[in-house]
Amino acid sequence: MMRILLFLATNLAVVLIASITLSLFGFNGFMAANGVDLNLNQLLVFCAVFGFAGSLFSLFISKWMAKMSTGTQIITQPRTRHEQWLLQTVEQLSRDAGIKMPEVGIFPAYEANAFATGWNKNDALVAVSQGLLERFSPDEVKAVLAHEIGHVANGDMVTLALVQGVVNTFVMFFARIIGNFVDKVIFKTENGQGIAYYITTIFAELVLGFLASAIVMWFSRKREFRADDAGARLAGTDAMIGALQRLRSEQGVPVNMPDSLTAFGINAGLKKGLAGLFMSHPPLEQRIEALRRRG
């Protein structure tokens, strides 16, 4: 119930704040003065509905998509002592974090990685790669699992879905304003919407969507520090630092995690310069230093 109320409150807040801001800056009058007959409030509501619908639909099917895209095999009956240990460890960490035990799976990948997903912290999935299980020590694997449980317990999947919904809303909204302005003012289309509207809107959505993704990734990086902190509480600070140091030693290994899951993986590769703005994870050095300061 609280998550539904949060979703509705976020939707309402986005629409109200944007509507008030546009009115204060006289945007409706500016558009009308330039011959653009556009009801901005109705457009904003339309964009909010579809913007949040897209992100929440992705959230609700995230477990299914994760299983399909990574080939994750869910452990229902452990066949080996490693699978038995994995289930017992996740059960213990979940209990300590105060959440229902998530589904546990293994996906076939050489890279050392793991992810958590799911629409609800009591209906989640935590999966680790075969490479991580084979090359990491039990303490390191436990720390990685604790990090992922931290994502689940912190409600990061829902939070990022709401952030993405806000971003989607404004990208759609401003892309359509730009499209209408170009179509009516520059190309002088009088009746309906001309081809310039559709071309400009699509182009604007691509450009604005690319730029707006930096906002989502910035927020994702902040959540990583929180998940590391949760991992340190559940598995121990030294173990969490050790796991990140081990990941740092494997940074040359290609990461093949689907883009839709990288925000909740433990390892998202390495980017430098401006590309770092579009990383879902902070540099490992920063994460290790934050844990050391934690003590």
Swiss-Prot record:
E.C. numbers = 3.4.24.-
Q: Membrane-spanning regions, if any?
A: 4-24, 42-62, 158-178, 199-219
Coiled coil location: none
| Active-site residues per Swiss-Prot or TrEMBL entry | 148
Q: How is the cofactor bound?
A: Binds 1 zinc ion per subunit.
Topology in the lipid bilayer: Multi-pass membrane protein
Q: What is this protein called?
A: Protease HtpX
Q: Please give the biological process terms from Gene Ontology that the record holds.
A: proteolysis
Q: Which residues bind Zn(2+)?
A: 147, 151, 224
Q: What's the family?
A: Belongs to the peptidase M48B family.
Question: Where would you find this protein in the cell?
Answer: Cell inner membrane
Name its co-factor(s): Zn(2+)
KW Metal-binding (keyword) present? yes
Gene Ontology molecular function, alphabetical:
metalloendopeptidase activity; zinc ion binding
- Where on the tree of life does the source sit, at the highest rank? Bacteria
Alphabetized UniProt keyword annotations: Cell inner membrane, Cell membrane, Hydrolase, Membrane, Metal-binding, Metalloprotease, Protease, Transmembrane, Transmembrane helix, Zinc
List the HAMAP family: Pept_M48_protease_HtpX (MF_00188)
Record-level GO cellular component terms: plasma membrane
Q: Which Pfam families match?
A: Peptidase_M48
Provenance organism: Pseudomonas syringae pv. tomato (strain ATCC BAA-871 / DC3000)
